[in-house]
């Protein structure tokens, strides 16, 4: 297996995505076709809230997949960012959603 280093160009690509989109979900698959249960749950939460979000399919780009883990110092996918700030994965999203906190952040 080849090791992928998180390069400055990968970090710059991630920062560009975050700068251009207020709500970003780095996920496995797309919002139309999630490829894992956690990504499906994260997508469903955001769709239920009715917020527009930008999805990034990490399965299509190994550099982004590894780079986003390093960028946010978070080991798993999906990862939700709101206004360039890492919120967390699907478990944290669900907890915040059930408490009404995620809806407040997305107003």
Give the residues covered by each predicted segment.
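Thiol/selenol-based redox catalytic cores and closely related redox-interacting motifs
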Residues: 3-10, 77, 86-87, 91
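Structural motif corresponding to alpha-helix initiation and N-cap regions
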Residues: 7-11, 61-65, 99
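Thiol/disulfide oxidoreductase modules built on the thioredoxin-like
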Residues: 70-76
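Local sequence-structure signature of Cys/Sec-based thiol-disulfide redox active-site neighborhoods
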Residues: 15-52
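Thiol-based oxidoreductase modules, predominantly thioredoxin-like and allied folds used
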Residues: 50-65
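Non-catalytic, surface beta->alpha helical segment in thiol-disulfide oxidoreductase systems
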Residues: 82-107
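Acidic beta-strand-to-loop metal/phosphate-binding motif
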Residues: 26, 79-83
């Amino acid at each position: 297996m080849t090791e992928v280093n998180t390069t400055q160009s990968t970090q710059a690509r991630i920062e560009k995505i975050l700068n251009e989109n207020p709500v970003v979900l780095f996920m496995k698959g797309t919002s139309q076709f999630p490829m894992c249960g956690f990504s499906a749950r994260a997508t469903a939460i955001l769709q239920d809230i009715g917020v527009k979000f930008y999805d990034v399919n990490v399965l299509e780009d190994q550099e982004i997949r590894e780079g986003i883990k390093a960028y946010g110092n978070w080991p798993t996918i999906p990862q939700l960012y709101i206004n360039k700030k890492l919120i967390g994965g699907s478990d944290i999203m669900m907890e915040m959603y059930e408490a009404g906190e995620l809806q407040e952040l997305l107003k």
